[in-house]
Regions:
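Composition-driven recognition of glycine/serine/threonine/acidic- and proline-rich low-complexity segments
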Residues: 1-200
Length: 200
């Protein structure tokens, strides 16, 4: 939303290889290009906002601590953070419901956003949390995970795929308090009568 005059902005392809760029664009729905912000000739400041109405969380990465994040939650990162597009959770969409996850590793800072507030849970070793996939934002790569259907056939037919992720610690899990699907469904209850009346 704003930046200091000392900030130099340069645009480049997000990945070094064309295949990596295409993979991140098609599967992750991220842009081909990314802006690099560098302070030149003195200190500088840059402010970012997220598209959804919600919080922005700052995650610190190290060689022994990375994160698995929802593709749409990515906002920005420092240069030494690597976004892995070859990870199976990204290339195969293991989380279902169009939910592709990106594995972030390296040394640096990662900024993620949520729809609604961020609810952080710290899991001890062996402790498990079951999370609705539409509310899952990120979790530590030290965690184990398993995606499965929730409920019976009736719930699946009425509620969609009905997938949840079981995340087992040790590590942190970040959950968003709102989800876009529920917002769209609610908006449609308001818009549907008008659409139908105009279609007659």
């Amino acid at each position: 939303t704003y930046m200091s005059p000392t900030i130099d902005v340069r645009t480049r392809k997000r990945e070094k290889s064309l295949l990596g760029t295409i993979g991140l664009t098609l599967l992750g729905r991220q842009t081909f290009f990314v802006n690099d912000y560098t302070a030149v000739g003195g200190k500088g400041e840059v402010a970012f906002t997220s598209a959804p109405i919600g919080d922005i969380e700052v995650l610190k990465l190290s060689p022994t601590r990375g994160y698995i994040i929802q593709k749409n939650s990515y906002v920005a990162s420092t240069p030494d953070v690597n976004l892995d597009v070859q990870w199976q959770g990204f290339t195969k969409g293991l989380f279902g419901q169009g939910l592709f996850m990106i594995k972030a590793t390296g040394q640096g800072t990662l900024f993620i956003n949520t729809f609604g507030a961020i609810d952080k849970h710290t899991l001890n070793a062996g402790e498990t949390l079951i999370v609705d996939n539409f509310h899952l934002v990120a979790f530590s790569d030290t965690c184990q995970y398993r995606v499965r259907k929730f409920g019976g056939l009736k719930e699946t037919l009425l509620g969609g795929e009905g997938l949840v992720t079981e995340v087992t610690g040790p590590g942190d899990v970040y959950i968003q308090t709102k989800n876009v699907k529920e917002l769209v469904d609610w908006l449609w209850t308001l818009l549907e009568p008008r659409v139908q009346s105009r279609a007659r």
